[in-house]
Amino acid sequence: MAVKKYEAGVKEYRQTYWAPEYVPLDSDILACFKITPQPGVDREEAAAAVAAESSTGTWTTVWTDLLTDMDYYKGRAYRIEDVPGDDTSFYAFIAYPIDLFEEGSVVNVFTSLVGNVFGFKAVRALRLEDVRFPLAYVKTCNGPPHGIQVERDKMNKYGRPMLGCTIKPKLGLSAKNYGRAVYECLRGGLDFTKDDENVNSQPFMRWRDRFLFVADAIHTAEAETGERKGHYLNVTAPSPEEMYERAEFAKELNMPIIMHDFLTGGFCANTGLARWCRKTGTLLHIHRAMHAVVDRNPHHGIHFRVLVKALRLSGGDHLHTGTVVGKLEGDRASTQGWVDLLRESFVPEDRSRGIFFDQDWGSMPGVFAVASGGIHVWHMPSLLAIFGDDAVFQFGGGTLGHPWGNAAGAAANRVALEACVEARNEGRDLEREGKDILTNAAKDSPELKIALETWKEIKFEFDTVDKLDVVNR
């Protein structure tokens, strides 16, 4: 048997990591990157460089390569595609053997795929557009603590989306006044209320005081309405120890659901908290604070659909997804694409919705999509048409901004939702007939009538920054 000779020096990445003949294995983790190379760096070399730097490569040949099977462990750039309307960038498809990654560790996957390679000088900009997690890897992750069906059973709510509200002002209220707002919203007809993402434990409202007043509000509202209620108590904290202390106290108070800011808190903390929630029977609401820092630039960063997949693997029962019709970024096709990635067991490749790979989730539970941000009663027909039943519609200002107060705002939203669900079940076109559906419902609901008058002129007519690059294949 001939001995492979070690040859020192620097060689082009394409010699090792460009493999257009490679057929990805079912067990490979596949990634699609949008690459904008530096002037003078051709596509194959740039794609191979990304494959190398995100897997086994370094800038020079090293003799220790001979101590392992580099052909097995290396990432392979196996396909390149044009980006429609952009002649400076291209899509590179890279396959990684599953054994490069620790089982069940979103942390480890991201450390490789979006690690040092994003500072690599050979590329001017780099964006991770999509990742295919093979079923063999999905099964190593715990996923959502409970999922959609179990949450419906716990909350005893079926046949419609859930209604929520983020308490406003998000900062500055005392714990007692905060609890009062929670009670009024839940008594008025909402299923959930919510801490905003930056409500932790500030001088004006320490976390323990907030938890106590909120628990009292929930128990009182449940007794008065006969319905199960919840409030997303944010347990995000400066350290894991403090996070678990807050979660444990929420459990002591018999709170059904807690909340975590999964990006600012980190995937390690989130996965640990999701496992705790599964063990204790606690639901977990996930906020995506900080996502736009990494996903809004269409040329550099990580697309939100990748963060969606990562969250489903790491664990959460709810995730904020944008609204399409509200104040936050997100076009309809893309949003419905990542909502399916949250909820469905199998999602086929669909470039018209920005989905680059088939994604098989096996039996992993789905996650409720949370529509939140600048929505009000006039949006209800479109929200139901876009998101369907397995969603939470959260009206912050659209509840608390009602001229008659919080309970009236909650009642208006509940009446609007139930009218739209009834119309949908009758086969009516929600988006075409939405105005008639709401105005007819308002004849028997003065709260809804006032809400419709208050927000009839409110629109968010801004174009989406991150547009789909639809590939004609």
Swiss-Prot record:
Residues holding substrate: N116, T166, K170, R288, H320, S372
N6-carboxylysine carried by residues: K194
Residues annotated as the enzyme's active site: K168 (proton acceptor), H287 (proton acceptor)
Gene3D superfamilies noted in UniProt: Ribulose bisphosphate carboxylase, large subunit, C-terminal domain, RuBisCO large subunit, N-terminal domain
EC assignment: 4.1.1.39
GO molecular function, one term: magnesium ion binding
Catalytic activity: 2 (2R)-3-phosphoglycerate + 2 H(+) = D-ribulose 1,5-bisphosphate + CO2 + H2O; D-ribulose 1,5-bisphosphate + O2 = 2-phosphoglycolate + (2R)-3-phosphoglycerate + 2 H(+)
Binding site for Mg(2+): K194, D196, E197
Swiss-Prot/TrEMBL site (Transition state stabilizer) positions: K327
Class in the EC hierarchy, top level: lyase
A biological process term (GO) from this entry: reductive pentose-phosphate cycle
Any coiled-coil regions, as ranges: none
Required co-factors: Mg(2+)
Subunit structure: Heterohexadecamer of 8 large chains and 8 small chains.
Misc. remarks from the entry: The basic functional RuBisCO is composed of a large chain homodimer in a 'head-to-tail' conformation. In form I RuBisCO this homodimer is arranged in a barrel-like tetramer with the small subunits forming a tetrameric 'cap' on each end of the 'barrel'.
Entry protein name: Ribulose bisphosphate carboxylase large chain 1
Species: Acidithiobacillus ferrooxidans (strain ATCC 23270 / DSM 14882 / CIP 104768 / NCIMB 8455)
